[in-house]
Structures are given as C-alpha cells and as structure tokens.
Amino acid sequence: GITTAVWAGIMENPIKEAIMKGAAFAKENECDFIIALGGGAVLDSSIAIAAMATNEGDLWDYVCGGTGKGKPLAQKGLPIVTIATTAGTGSEINCWGVISNLETKEKIGFGNPTLTPVLAIVDPELMLTVPAKYTAYQGFDALFHHTEVMMSNGVNVLSETIALSAIANIAKYLPRAVANGNDLEAREHIAYGSTMAGITMQLTSTTAQHSMEHA
C-alpha cells in the first residue's frame, strides 16, 4: 500500500509562511509526491510547496517579481496530482500559484514549467455542494480568464479556439449551475470552462487586469 500524510494548513489567499510549513511537512514525511485536493488556494499552494520541498532556502529566493531574488530552482519539485473541488481558477493544470508575503506586503505569482501537475482530476460531482454565490464568483473568474486571453497581445489560433468554446459554455451553463447546484450537466460544462482556462493562460497570457484583481 501507499503511506499517506495529510497536511491541512492552507487558507484563502495563501501566505509564504504556510507554504514553508507545508514544504517542511513534506520533507519530514519524506513525501514522494503531492495530492492537492481543494480549490484555487490549495492548488496554487501545491505548486510552491512542491518546489520548496526539494529546494533549500526561502520561497522568495525563487520568486522573480517584487523583492524576490529570482534564483532558478536547483532541483525539480515533487510531482503534483490535483483534484479540483471548485470551477474557477484553472490552477489544476497550470504551473503557477499566487502567494502573499506579509512581511514585504506583496502578492506575486510563482511558478515554473517543471511544476505543472502530472495529473488533474476534474470531477463535477465534487463541485455539487459549492454554494450558489461562490459558484457565480468562480464561474466569472473562469470567464474573465478567457476574455483576458482574447484581449492579450499573445493570443493565437489555438488559445482563441479554446477560449471561445469555454466562453460559450460558461455563458450558457453558469446561470443553470447558480440556479441549481445539483445540475450535474451545468457543473460539468463550467468545470470544462475553468480547466480550459488553465490551458489558454499557459498558451497566451493574461492582461494587466489580472494583476489588479489579485491586488
């Protein structure tokens, strides 16, 4: 069998201190890989924890923006398996996470292509209990990711094709998912739209409003 160790120290808008604690936990338990079960905060955190579980120093040593030192990762991070329980961020399939540093008062994206999850499980049945308000918030998050991609200077034929499909799905099915959280068909289409955002953001980029939203 597989020995497991559970760490549940992630909060909304994850902070650097939590990341370092999670990485220390992974080291102490000699984890071979990470399973990230949750919404955007958990999925974002798994990226940074996976990196710091195999690299020395502080997370901000490897952050490229702000006061980060921008050092390259010396070691490849732990493999990540993601299980999404919300539909909004698309973090289950991309290699970036947004982490806050309370000491420097910064909130910055951290990532590396080598930290892309090796497997993503996107099951809309896990999203049936998300309240209507948060279903709406998360659905608009996914929608705006795709609209940013369409406005980006880096948009290309592949990212445009995926983004337009996702926008159509979200526009059609988000009202249904908000009205009836048990509508599995609607949940499935919103999950599709969210996950595709993880792809389009990797293929293109977001715009300045993305950073403004995080701020």
Task: Cite the ranges covered by each PLM segment.
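Small-residue-rich anion-binding loops in enzyme active sites
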Residues: 1
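Short glycine-rich or small-residue beta-strand-to-loop segments that form or flank ligand, phosphate
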Residues: 5-8, 34-37, 198-200
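Short beta->alpha junction loops
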Residues: 6-16
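Active-site nucleophile and cofactor-binding loops and adjacent substrate-binding regions
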Residues: 10-11, 37-39, 204-209
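Glycine/threonine-rich beta-strand-loop-alpha-helix active-site module
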Residues: 19-122
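Carboxylate- and glycine-rich phosphate/diphosphate-binding segment that chelates Mg2+/Mn2+
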Residues: 96-204
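Catalytic phosphate/nucleotide-handling subdomain of diverse soluble enzymes
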Residues: 214-215
